[in-house]
Amino acid sequence: MKKLSKKQIKHLRQLSEIAYEKELSFYLDNLRNRFDEWKSGNIDVWALSDIIHEFHDGKSRDLYKFYVSGDDYALHVAHAVKNNFVMFDEIEESCREHVQHLLNNFFLDTPKE
């Protein structure tokens, strides 16, 4: 694969930031539902506290490490496309081949959690 230009990297970085926000929002919405369960009495405060702790030390930290600690923006975007947080047609034409290559080689049967 050709080396990406600065313009392509900038575009992929922007999509990566959008993907991180969308994916974190998705999981935070799931966490919010657990608050609703607590408010309705389906779980107690201790269970909710454990759920919050698990989210913070688990999914939230994993997303941070993946999106913020790494700088492989094309990989971030491929992950986001595979998991429907970014649509393939949102990717600039000049970057699509690179992202498609990653999708074909690294995200073949990766299910969305």
Regions found by a protein language model. Give the residues of each.
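Acidic, Ser/Pro/Thr-rich low-complexity regulatory regions
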Residues: 1-113
